[in-house]
């Protein structure tokens, strides 16, 4: 998993551009919960989906 993928990080889904920008809510093992602008909260498996890191919340 990308070391930048941690709570508060801003990400995009590589195959779902329509979901918009997402903010990582939690990371537990390979499970990442992200709150996307247009898709709401989604639980993703980082072994299956490699999220694109956009930046930090700060």
Question: Which functions belong to the PLM regions below?
Answer:
Residues 2-58:
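Basic/aromatic-rich interaction segments and small domains that mediate binding to polyanionic partners
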